[in-house]
From Swiss-Prot:
InterPro entries: PSI_PsaX (IPR012986), PSI_PsaX_sf (IPR036243). One of its GO terms (cellular component) is photosystem I. Its main location: membrane. It is found in: Cellular thylakoid membrane. Belongs to the PsaX family. Pfam families: PsaX. It comes from Trichormus variabilis (strain ATCC 29413 / PCC 7937) (Anabaena variabilis). The chain crosses the membrane at residues 23-43. This is Photosystem I 4.8 kDa protein. Keywords: Membrane, Photosynthesis, Photosystem I, Thylakoid, Transmembrane, Transmembrane helix. It is a single-pass membrane protein. GO terms for biological process: photosynthesis.
């Protein structure tokens, strides 16, 4: 098989918008810890 000369992802030099997915990840992680604290009776 011949190698493709173009990359699979276009190299435009643009900064990917990681802030949106990072905000959602931190929010879900916080909710996860909140549910865990409730489950282990750390909070009532």
């Amino acid at each position: 098989m011949a190698k493709a000369k173009t990359p699979a992802v276009a190299n435009t030099g643009a900064k990917p918008p990681y802030t949106f997915r990072t905000a959602w990840a931190l929010l879900l992680l916080g909710v996860n810890f909140l549910v865990a604290a409730y489950y282990f009776h750390i909070i009532q």
